[in-house]
Design a protein with these regions (language model features):
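Extracytoplasmic/secreted proteins, especially bacterial periplasmic and envelope-associated proteins
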Residues: 11, 56, 97, 140, ...
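Secondary-structure transition/turn motif
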Residues: 128-135, 262, 272
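Leloir-type glycosyltransferase catalytic cores
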Residues: 289-320
């Protein structure tokens, strides 16, 4: 995901409000149909949009994302002296994992590709969200999930049976996209060279990332038959949401996978590692389906001692 450059704005409205020592009213719109309204140890849904510390800011940003808002404005109170500085810290591209982590707790349909934070030194904060999925993609994916559901789900299946069936369906119809990482590395080099030449010249358009497959999204495995870990994970998260099962995504520095709350316990599901890239002696890819990382608890996951599964336990506190 990409975090846009922060812009500083001076607004007459905020100046007038500050002069009279009042806080402008906050407009809270209706949440969209994909809002989960779930709170976790790390971050919580809030109805109070006046922040007094960093946790309050995280809760506001999380609520904005979970609600599916395209734009939201709130204000730093005079008592919160470090508010703008904390906003700068959270928004710094060097700290991009702060905002992307919030996206792991929400519906994939409400997740973002750009999260712009505009602020002025008087404390007006405006968030602008560009969502990862378009309405057209959401309709297409939802219809595809419904179609697969009719094909593989039987009336006597339990929730775990349905998860198992989708786990196998996605893996059997998908291959890990080894090309994606090479294309992304080439794009990042191209983008770096662009800014070295053009700097902050806004008349020049930066190149866009155009991978062969949309492997980082649910459209990859469901339609193009290729995925990287985020594509597998989004597809499974959408299924878990459809089942009404509490779930979120877990991210390490190099990987992402699902966890679901089953029988009063958080269980890990890693489709990527259950769909390994295997090749025969001639170098031909061999389709492989495993259940090694299907609904396993945290102690079992940790027994494998896989570096990709080294996540921040101060964030994903529920996983014990």
């Amino acid at each position: 995901m990409t975090l846009a450059v922060i812009l500083e704005l001076d607004t007459i409205v905020k100046v007038i409000a500050n002069y009279f020592n009042t806080t402008p009213s906050i407009v809270v719109e209706k949440k969209n149909q994909y809002a989960k309204n779930l709170s976790f140890e790390y971050v919580q849904i809030t109805n109070d949009f006046v922040p007094y510390n960093i946790q309050d800011l995280l809760n506001i940003f999380y609520t904005v994302l979970d609600s599916g808002y395209d734009k939201f404005t709130f204000y730093c109170p005079n008592e919160y002296l470090d508010c703008v500085n904390d906003i700068k810290m959270i928004s710094d591209p060097e700290n991009s994992e702060i905002l992307t982590t919030l996206g792991n707790y929400i519906s994939p349909y409400n997740n973002f590709t750009y999260f712009n934070i505009l602020y002025d030194n008087l404390g007006e904060i405006t968030v602008e969200v560009t969502h990862l999925y378009t309405d057209e993609e959401i309709n297409k994916i939802s219809n595809k999930i419904d179609s697969i559901w009719k094909e593989i789900v039987k009336p006597d299946m339990t929730q775990e049976d349905i998860i198992y069936a989708f786990h196998d369906y996605i893996i059997n119809s998908t291959r890990y996209d080894e090309l994606y990482e090479k294309e992304l590395a080439a794009y990042e080099l191209e983008l770096k060279e662009f800014y070295q030449v053009n700097g902050a010249d806004t008349t020049k358009k930066a190149p866009k990332f155009t991978p062969t497959y949309h492997s980082n999204k649910a459209t990859g495995p469901l339609f193009e038959k290729f995925a990287i870990c985020s594509g597998y994970t989004d597809a499974m998260a959408i299924v878990l949401d459809k089942l009404g099962i509490k779930n979120f995504k877990v991210a390490s520095d190099t990987h992402v996978w699902n966890v679901a709350y089953i029988n009063n316990k958080w269980m890990h599901i890693d489709l990527t590692w259950d769909d390994p890239v295997s090749k025969d002696s001639s170098g031909k890819i061999v389709d492989t389906l495993l259940h090694k990382f299907y609904l396993i608890d945290t102690p079992t996951l940790e027994e494998f001692k896989i570096a990709n599964h080294n996540y921040d336990k101060s964030v994903y506190i529920e996983l014990k």
